[in-house]
């Protein structure tokens, strides 16, 4: 959401081609990972297959999962704190962050987490529908989207964030990152472990891709039409709620922060569980001699 907001708000539709490349990268990477996980003749996971190619993959991915797990959790933690400070206007970033990390730790291994997760998913659906409805109300520019999709060029820098930085951020966040290698563990959680599950996995992944694309394009449109068209820019986190508050008023600002909190809180749990499993898998494979 942040990447799309800044891209649309600061550069209009000029970087639209980046999201096309990023989505294509994500589809290729995740599809290859899922196909190997479900259909390889050895009945092994992706990390196991990489470890058979070279023994260093196991310790490398173990260390990478630990390091990047701390990096991911750090910025998500800060995001939670900033969301609550901006929403309520009181407290400190680290105070709120510590509180909600404590809540996550307390409930993640208890049956109650499933119910909490469903509530947050409901909030995410509400946020997505709000972005989509507001974007349709504002109205995207088909010609601007078309030109931006075919541009394949970086515009001059506007504001604090260079177009190259935004491009790298989108390619990493959407296209390819270490988190793609966590996907097989969530397939196992769903019980999808055999070639016969390939079809349902593909449908599930395509649905997730469609939802992601709709959300990204909605946020991008709001940034381009509400902010960029008026010469406004996104410089701080408190500029982001204007994507909804320009149309929905104060309720839009509140909805934005509540939705962002839902995204970040579920990410705290998801990153911790997924990357921890990758790290432990890498350790076990390394100790077994790959």
Identify the meaning behind each predicted range.
Residues 39, 57-89, 264-283:
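Hydrophobic transmembrane alpha-helices that form the core helical bundles
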């Amino acid at each position: 959401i942040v990447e799309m907001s800044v891209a649309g708000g600061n550069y209009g539709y000029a970087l639209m081609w980046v999201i096309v490349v990023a989505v294509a990268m994500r589809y290729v990477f995740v599809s290859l990972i899922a196909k190997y996980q479900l259909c390889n003749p050895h009945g092994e996971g992706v990390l196991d297959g990489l470890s058979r190619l070279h023994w260093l993959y196991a310790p490398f991915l173990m260390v990478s999962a630990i390091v990047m797990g701390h990096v991911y959790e750090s910025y998500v933690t800060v995001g939670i704190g900033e969301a609550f400070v901006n929403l309520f206007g009181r407290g400190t970033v680290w105070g709120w962050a510590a509180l909600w990390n404590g809540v996550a730790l307390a409930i993640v291994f208890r049956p109650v987490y499933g119910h909490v997760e469903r509530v947050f998913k409901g909030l995410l659906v509400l946020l997505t529908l709000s972005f989509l409805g507001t974007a349709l109300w504002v109205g995207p520019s088909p010609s601007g989207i078309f030109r931006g999709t075919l541009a394949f060029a970086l515009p001059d820098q506007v504001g604090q964030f260079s177009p190259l930085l935004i491009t790298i951020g989108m390619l990493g966040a959407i296209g390819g990152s270490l988190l793609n290698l966590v996907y097989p563990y969530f397939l196992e959680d769903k019980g999808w472990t055999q070639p016969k599950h390939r079809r349902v996995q593909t449908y599930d992944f395509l649905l997730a891709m469609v939802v992601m694309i709709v959300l990204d394009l909605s946020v991008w449109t709001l940034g381009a039409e509400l902010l960029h068209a008026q010469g406004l820019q996104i410089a701080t986190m408190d500029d982001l709620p204007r994507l909804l508050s320009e149309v929905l008023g104060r309720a839009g600002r509140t909805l934005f922060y509540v939705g962002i909190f839902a995204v970040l809180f579920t990410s705290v749990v998801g990153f911790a569980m997924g990357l921890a499993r990758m790290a432990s898998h890498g350790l076990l494979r390394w100790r077994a001699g790959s």
